[in-house]
């Protein structure tokens, strides 16, 4: 081998190695971690019945929330959903530093608005109230720029062809599987609803596993709208139980997707029906807030309970009836709340021209 060839070969090797490193093929996997000490604000996502659009609200203290777009949708449902409307938004910060959202692809007033000829997509007798087949998936690096896709649950696996609904998706990172576990309410035909879990692909566009039941309510009773929060070594599965009304209960397990045992003690403080429970932690405090949708009052509102031990819950009332406040919006539906950094909150406020300090 002559010297000229060796020099050329060396240059080629350097070029190849540089290319592999720059494309990430040899790069060490980076998992951005943002600890609670870096958090400085809260982001609430919700929707409204009158628009079936997606809304964002910010809070500095976790008590008072301000809509970023003056109570107008930040994303219109008809731009991302097959049914031209979304419901039940959920948001999480992924292990890769990206933000992930999952929403129900459903418009319950589509016929009234001339968006379809029938009350529901399919027969209400055969597939039930609010029948749908899809979920909307969103992904963003910065809470501002979003990509989206529609996951047709009924087409994902042959076993799901006859589903009656796919509602209220939520997500949690399963570190053991290195995957986002998504779980959502589902029924077959016009049968009973319960919650199923699945693992998403890396691109967050498809399910990798056939959904399985995550929890069986005693005596086969129906339940909907699950939320999983890990505290210590325990997983707390909050649900909307349909056992003698609609109210919030929890089941507890040592495992993320199995072994849940019901604690039938009610967690909400409502006299009437509520659903869509979700938990967020107060920054720097040993306190968690349970927030849920009190759909049975008019106008509907959110209700709140607070806990420090996940056994005893102190009722905080509704928005604008106690310590929890809104500054510029009302009649919200189906909430989810995450902690965000001061910089993320400021960037989001600047995007929507919201004058708010953090």
Question: Where are the regions a protein language model picked out?
Answer:
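Bacterial Sec-dependent N-terminal signal peptides
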Residues: 1-33
